[in-house]
Regions:
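Active-site-proximal alpha-helical scaffold in enzymes
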Residues: 1-2, 7-21, 203-218
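Cysteine-centered functional microenvironments
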Residues: 2-5, 83-91, 117-122, 187-200, ...
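Condensing-enzyme catalytic core mediating Claisen C-C bond formation in acyl metabolism
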Residues: 7-105, 236-314
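Accessory "access/gating" subregions that flank catalytic or transport cores
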Residues: 116-190
Length: 314
């Protein structure tokens, strides 16, 4: 709460089995990476002088030394904020720049072209339509490199000069029927689940894979076809890679109930959501499912802060 990056937040996890002889998707060797230092989204780590803090609360380190908060040998107290510092427009620009550069390096290494050789794409999605909104700026460069910009201009109904530049042409193209059809075929299946979950950070692109597999489950013709992955992490870094679907990949999806997992989630109130972030919630919001759960956190002696877990059997 109370962060400009709040609307990008989500929660979830995706588990994958990585095998030497996979039955669903075989990853290609080629990988493209782009890295550049950027403060587009980060959770600050701040340090405060311990003596100044003690004075601010009306005491001294000597009088407070027997309290575990003050008794550490460090001269500073560090604060790790969970509320991010976020610059949305700048982060979008970083996303496009990193993905475009990483994609170029991937294409050079793989000897492939995303526009021609990928039947679909999975994006890192900090919010629902990030991929489809950012892709026109990147795709126009790819079309231009292949001498196909006139095709985009025809679909957009305006030339680059008439639109007022490449970025304006990308915006016009993104509203065209041709681009909407492109999104429905190549991008939509991979973003459907994330639209209902939100940003899962590292897991986001793999939720895209799960979503795409479910979305393409009735496509028996996709064995041997290549799926592209475009990841991004603020700070900033992108990794682009691809994988080829196995001929019988649909047979491996029988136990995958994505819709059931989404429908059976437990909703919480906004007050509970705020309490979780403020760390004022004193207990779990839902009964524990089978597995290891936090039992208690020790509060005394050398065990101060030690977390104890117990196993719950349903």
């Amino acid at each position: 709460p109370h962060s400009p990056g709040e609307y990008t937040q989500g929660a979830g996890a995706v588990a994958l089995l990585v095998a030497e002889d996979p039955r669903i998707l075989v990853l290609d060797d080629a990988v493209g990476v782009s890295v550049e230092s950027a403060a587009d989204f980060f959770k600050p780590r701040r340090s405060f002088d311990k003596g100044e803090l003690a004075a601010a609360v009306g005491g001294t380190l000597e009088t407070a030394a027997d309290h575990p908060f003050w008794a550490t040998p460090d001269s500073v107290i560090e604060q790790f904020l969970e509320f991010p510092v976020f610059d949305g427009p700048y982060s979008n620009d970083c996303y496009v720049a990193r993905v475009r550069e990483a994609l170029g390096r991937y294409e050079a290494e793989a000897g492939l072209r995303a526009m021609n050789d990928w039947f679909g794409m999975c994006f890192h999605l900090p919010y629902a339509f990030q991929g489809r909104r950012m892709w026109p700026d990147i795709a126009l460069d790819l079309y231009a490199e292949q001498g196909l910009l006139a095709q985009v201009e025809s679909e957009a109904g305006v030339t680059e000069a008439e639109a007022g530049g490449r970025k304006a042409l990308a915006k016009a193209w993104s509203k065209s029927a041709a681009y909407k059809a492109y999104v429905a075929e190549k991008i939509g299946p991979g973003e459907a689940a994330s639209m209902r979950v939100g940003n899962m950070y590292t897991a986001s692109i793999f939720m895209g894979l799960v979503s795409a597999l479910v979305g393409y489950a009735d496509r028996r013709d996709l064995g041997g076809k290549r799926l592209g992955f475009l990841s991004y992490g603020s700070g900033s870094k992108s990794k682009v890679f691809s994988g080829v679907l196995r001929a019988n990949f649909t047979a491996q999806l029988r136990g995958l109930d994505l819709e059931g997992a989404l429908v059976n989630r437990r909703g919480i109130s906004f007050a509970a959501y705020e309490a979780l972030h403020a760390r004022t919630a004193q207990g779990p919001l839902a009964p524990a499912s089978e597995g290891a759960v936090l039992d208690r956190i020790e509060t005394e002696g050398n065990l101060l802060g030690y977390r104890r877990y117990r196993w719950v059997q349903n």
